[in-house]
């Protein structure tokens, strides 16, 4: 079509969910709710090669009707309908020996039914976890650029997320020590920048992939009357090695690290790393294999997190 390729498609889904949570001890409130959701999706995409490169233009249309009932009564404030169009466009070309691509996409992420549930979960006498039927879908705008030369690759990405879903804690009642934990939508857009450089050399029996990157967000939240800036970046490094040995042996050595830093309203307060090693022997033209491996040899794959919220 028009010297290019045109594709269309669609899907339809209907979901009915019912939750009946009864707590006779009255540690947490009992609840009786149900949700009906109808989702109609259609998409179209056009791609074409021209003299200076290749481009793709597309769009995705979503119509969602969500009805929420509590004790068999329709709750208008928590029921909603969506009609949205999410475009995508990309262009790729070659400049000398460098391949490059730039793309822009808009995507949506619906909250899970577990997060939308109105039931409460008793954790201990100091904390109760609850769903949130009022959660909205996340909408993320992505702008990405990728360039590659031989075995080197550089990627830059910028994301702007509206209605980002975060885990939040606040007192269940005034002057009480019990904390209510639930997911909420941020009331502001969440910008995030990421940059990665990777190399994938292959020399003789050795094949390797090294990736180094940084992810940084810009977020300020109100926590217990104070403005907290959650802007500390996180650094990531991954090194994967494989050695093809005689007699169908394959030796692998993998390493990864993640630094401290912020991700939404969670602070990762520990440097995390691991080293894995494995030796595999294959038989019968790879139809049978035996592997011996050791994971996290130095026992450094540990995490320590801090939830920043209103509690």
Residue positions per predicted region:
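Residues on the lipid-exposed face of transmembrane beta-strands in outer-membrane beta-barrel proteins
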Residues: 1, 42-48, 89-93, 143-149, ...
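Outer-membrane beta-barrel translocator domains and adjoining extracellular loop/strand segments
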Residues: 18-27, 67-75, 113-121, 126-128, ...
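Outer-membrane beta-barrel signature, preferentially recognizing the C-terminal barrel domain
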Residues: 34-37, 77-80, 108-162, 179-194, ...
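Membrane-embedded beta-strand positions of outer-membrane beta-barrel proteins
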Residues: 8-10, 57-59, 89, 102-104, ...
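Transmembrane beta-strands of outer-membrane beta-barrel pores
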Residues: 12-18, 48-52, 61-67, 93-97, ...
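Conserved C-terminal beta-signal and adjacent last beta-strands/turns
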Residues: 89, 230-311
